[in-house]
Structure formats: structure tokens, C-alpha cells
Amino acid sequence: MSQLWDKEGRGSIPINWTISPGLVDFGPALLNYYYDTATENDCFASGPSGLGYSLIYDSHNYIWNSDSGEAISPYVKWTQQYLEKSGLRIITIWDEINDEQRSAYARYCRYLYGLTLQDWEHQPYKLPTLVQDRNLPVIANLPCYANGVDVIYSFWQDTIAKFDGSKPLFLSAQGESWKMGPDNIVALKERLEALSPGNIVICRGDHFFNLYRKANGLPFNLTLSPDVTVKTSLSKTSSDLVADGSAAEKQMWVSGTDDGKAWIQFDFKKKYLISRYVVRHAGNAGLPDSLNTRDFKLEVSNDGKKWESADCQSGNTMPVTDVDIVPVKARYIRLSITDSGEDQRARIADIEIYGSVL
């Protein structure tokens, strides 16, 4: 991967790179290197099928190595822990999973934006695109393990040519990394544009699934929306870092004061039904847990002037705060911090606010 990573052109177009969440334990320096040198167009996803290479269904030999949702649940729970530690939001399954197994991922991998499966068939699709248990998008990579632009183009050509613009069309493919690079993806986009001018968007996996959630009426991470604006109290780093989708230390928001108090405010430009929020503190970025934000509250507003409390946390020591709140309609969200941790300088690695279109 390091050879591909150093190829000229990386960062010019969104690409999703599969890595192992186990790097947290057996290769933390490697994981840090990739995060530290990633561009805003590089997105990391978990390789098959979570923590370690697990071949659940062998498509070539038509063999289920496991077909039990109960049997796979401990593995999925363990995977969830390492997804949080590694910051990975997408898993590509090797090759397929059944309904019981999809339910296990939906139930125990709360951190996931979505799953991709490997569809080895030709059109029409063998594997359906679906939302598992009303909260986890599952999309097939068709083609999978494509060895060049021509292969992907041949699979997508007819579908894109028939696109009428009435609703979004989501397509996912997997390329052989040792045979494809950024230049190939650029060439693919140019060829697809000729089929449907102005309608082709190549995007990161986290953005892909976030847009899919929005298009299908599911709660989605509002902080990834392109029109959101962020304001903060005095800070040492850019306010954009509180909602860039990364919990890496170099992309952490840091308060400009050390009096323990700080605030972060989002304007989503219109009202949404807010139902969940996630705060990733200093510990989630690899810093000591003693620097995690201790006391804070989530406030909501429709005009940016009158605020109401939606949730309050006191004495927090955990690196991640993940809370389902009573659904509330709001345009503005504010995180108000009153105790920033050991040195009283607030550090927020990332914030996610989940809402649905009204």
C-alpha cells in the first residue's frame, strides 16, 4: 500500500483505502502515518470483514463458512471496539452475509456508516441494496476486484445512461489496488461524465453513505453537509476541524483558552429532526484520557438566540460520548463546555450530529 500511497496524483480525487482496524494494536505507527499524510480526499475503510480477514461466504466455492447471526455476534462486537479506536466507518464484507448476520452488524456496530458486499455476478445485480433493520445501509460492490477502468465502465454504462435525474443513483465498485490508482479513477470519471454530463460525483465512502442515508430518509450526520457553518469560542486551530469526519490528533479542534470553558455552534441552515449526537474527545485521538472533556451540554435552537438543553453530561472520562436524545426539531446546535479536563483546555477531535429531513 505504501507504494500506491506515494503515487503521484493521490488527493486529486476521492479514493477509499482498505486497511485493518487491528493496526491499532500491531501497527500503530503505520496507522498514524497514513492518517497524518492523508488528504481530504483519502478515506479509510475496514478490510474484510472487520477485525481481521474473515471470509464469511466464499462466492467462488458457494460455501458459507458461517451462516449464524449468533455465532458472528462476538466477532462483530469486537470489531466495533476497533472501529472506534481506528476511526474506520465502513466495512467491506468478504464476500456476503445473510439477514441474521447483517442484523448483527446493524445492532452491534453502531459506529458504522455502511457495509459493502462483494457481488461477483454480472448484471442484473445478484445482491440487493438495502437498509438493514432501518439503520444500516448495505450496498454491493459491482464489479468487485475490477482490474481496470474498462471493467467498471462496462458494468455501469447502461445504468448511468438511463439515469433520468428523478432521484439519486448510488453505485459502488471495488478495484484491485495493485492495478488501479488515482489516475485511473480520474479517467473513469471522465468517461462516465460523457454518459450523463454534470451528474457524476466520485466521493469518499463516508460521504457516500451519508448521502445515501439522507436520500432514503434515515438519520444522517449533519456535520458532513457542505452548507453547514461552524462557529466556536476562541481557538488555536480551525473551527472546521470539529466536523471534518476525522478524529486524528492533527485534525483536532483546540481551545485558545485554558479556563475550562468553551463552546462550538453549528448552523444547518434549516430545521432537522435531531435524534443523536457523538463527541470524540482527546482520548479518541490518542491523547491521555485525562484530557477528555468532563462537563458539557448539548443545546438546541431554531433562531440562534433562544437555547434549550437537549442533554447534559457530567464527570465524563470516556473518549467517546454517544447519546440518543429525545428527538427535537432544531436548526442550530451548540456544545457548551464547562469543564475541559485535566489542563482545562478543551480538545474536541470530532462532533457528529444526526438528524432527519423534516
Residue ranges and their predicted role:
Residues K236-T237, S246-S309, S314-L358:
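Aromatic, loop-rich ligand-recognition surfaces of beta-strand-rich domains
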Residues G22-D25, L51-Y53, I97-D99, E176-M180, ...:
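Short, solvent-exposed loop/turn segments at secondary-structure junctions
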Residues M1-R10:
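Non-catalytic propeptide/linker segments at domain boundaries
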Residues T18-E100:
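Metal-dependent polysaccharide deacetylase catalytic core of the NodB/CE4 family, i.e.
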Residues F26-G27, S54-Y57, E100-S103, Y125, ...:
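Extracytoplasmic/secreted cell-surface and envelope-processing proteins
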Residues P219-A247:
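Predominantly extracellular/luminal regions of secreted and cell-surface proteins
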Residues S59-S68, T129-R134, N216-L218:
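Short, surface-exposed amphipathic charged segments that create phosphate/polyanion-binding patches used
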Residues M1-S2, G22, S86-N216:
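Catalytic grooves of carbohydrate-active enzymes
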